[in-house]
């Protein structure tokens, strides 16, 4: 069995007048993430990790931010398409380990919902998705609440 590991990272700016989508769910917050799509940094980091593990470039290559068809798209659609892309190359997801960096909103209570939603999109068990949340102790752009970032590591294996 061929096992591969991928790493993904994404960051988006927090702005007024946008909804805050994280981990495939809508969160109540006075600001949202700015981006061509819904700007869900966690989903984008997972997509990049999956594509990287399969040596299939990155999310911007497959879903360019200058393509009208992806304007304001639900990132869960991009995730589903990413899973289909790696499956077409003969890979399935083993597990995902991800971290969201945000000062606010507090995310602990939302993590089980994120796991469930993302598991359904990817067709895997929620137990195979670890999501953690942390702050940067008020340091940097995250600490100043100017943006939110996410990191993801994935394991995929050849079917």
Curated annotation (Swiss-Prot):
Disulfide bonds listed in the record: none
Pathway: Isoprenoid biosynthesis; isopentenyl diphosphate biosynthesis via DXP pathway; isopentenyl diphosphate from 1-deoxy-D-xylulose 5-phosphate: step 4/6
Superkingdom of this protein's organism: Bacteria
EC number: 4.6.1.12
Biological process (GO), any one: isopentenyl diphosphate biosynthetic process, methylerythritol 4-phosphate pathway
HAMAP family to which the protein is assigned, alphabetical: IspF (MF_00107)
Annotated protein name in UniProt: 2-C-methyl-D-erythritol 2,4-cyclodiphosphate synthase
């Amino acid at each position: 069995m061929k096992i591969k590991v991928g790493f993904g990272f994404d960051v988006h700016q927090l702005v007024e007048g946008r909804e805050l989508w994280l981990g495939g769910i809508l969160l109540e917050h006075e600001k949202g993430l700015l981006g061509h799509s819904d700007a869900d940094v966690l989903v984008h980091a997972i997509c990049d990790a999956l594509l990287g593990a399969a040596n299939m470039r990155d999310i911007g290559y497959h879903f360019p931010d200058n393509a009208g068809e992806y304007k304001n798209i639900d990132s869960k659609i991009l995730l589903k398409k990413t899973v289909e892309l790696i499956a077409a190359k003969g890979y399935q997801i083993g597990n995902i380990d991800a971290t969201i960096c945000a000062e606010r909103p507090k995310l602990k209570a939302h993590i089980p919902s994120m796991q469930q939603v993302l598991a359904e999109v990817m067709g895997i068990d929620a137990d195979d998705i670890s999501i953690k949340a942390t702050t940067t102790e008020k340091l940097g752009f995250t600490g100043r609440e100017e943006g939110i970032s996410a990191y993801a590591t994935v394991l995929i294996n050849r079917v």
